[in-house]
Swiss-Prot record:
Substrate binds at T41. Mg(2+) binds at T16, D49, E108. It is found in: Cytoplasm. This is ATP-dependent dethiobiotin synthetase BioD. The active site is at K37. It comes from Mycobacterium marinum (strain ATCC BAA-535 / M). The gene is bioD.
Length: 226
């Protein structure tokens, strides 16, 4: 299987724009790409990460499983909606059904690594274990990011989930000493796969495609497809 999971050190670090950029670059390279967001919350206020990924990346195969109207953590959103979360097995089988030889299947989580996506407490880390998938970690640039990133990497290592690298999801136009120092320190924790400029999601579709084409190392992207 060629499944890559995408998580963040917390919510709001740029998982969706990073997923879109990687999908766009792979798509432009002629790779068959599908993007899965198994659990989406906030649909009642217009949050639709899959639609945003499709708009920015040009990828047309966009797959979700569970959607809840309130912008809350999945467990709370499901409770408020009076609907169950999917089971861990349902999520795993759903994702496995998308994958095939020569295809890159990107799976974006909700919030951070250990946010519950399935009933009985299943998380994106659990899905990665079941799928044998690596995890790409989207990180912030500012204060606190080193601790958040180290904790995320430690949680991955505890379950022997491979870290595919880090991505800075929103690099400021005018970075200060803190951001520059953090960038260097983050690169010592795990390979830095890409650095996306703040505001990338506001680019036109054409400009986003240009940006994405060179965002990640092409040779690394090619290795993602089995």
């Amino acid at each position: 299987m060629t499944v890559l999971c995408v998580t963040g050190t917390c919510t709001g670090v740029g998982k969706t724009v990073v997923t879109a950029a990687l999908a766009s670059q792979a798509n432009q390279a002629g790779i068959d790409v599908v993007v899965c967001k198994p659990v989406q919350t906030g649909t009642g206020i217009g949050d639709d990460d899959l639609a945003e990924i499709g708009r920015l990346s040009g990828v047309t195969e966009l797959v979700g499983l569970a959607r809840y109207p309130l912008p809350m953590a999945p467990v709370a959103a499901a409770e408020q909606a009076g609907q169950p979360l999917p089971s861990r097995d349902q999520l795993v089988q759903h994702i496995r059904g998308l994958d095939r030889p020569g295809r890159l299947t990107l799976v974006e989580g909700a919030g951070g690594l250990l946010v519950e996506l399935a009933d009985s407490g299943g998380t994106l880390r659990d899905l990665a274990v079941d799928l044998g998938a690596a995890m790409l970690v989207v990180v912030a640039a500012g204060l606190g990011t080193l601790n958040h990133t180290a904790l995320t990497l430690e949680a991955l290592a505890a379950q022997k989930v491979s870290c595919a690298g880090l991505v800075l999801g929103s690099w400021p136009a005018h970075p200060g000493l803190v951001e520059s120092s953090n960038r260097d320190a983050l690169a010592r924790l795990a390979p830095m796969r890409a650095v996306l400029s703040a505001g990338a999601a506001q680019l036109s579709v054409a400009d986003f495609a240009v940006m994405s084409a060179g965002a990640f190392d092409r040779e690394w992207v090619a290795t993602l497809v089995g």
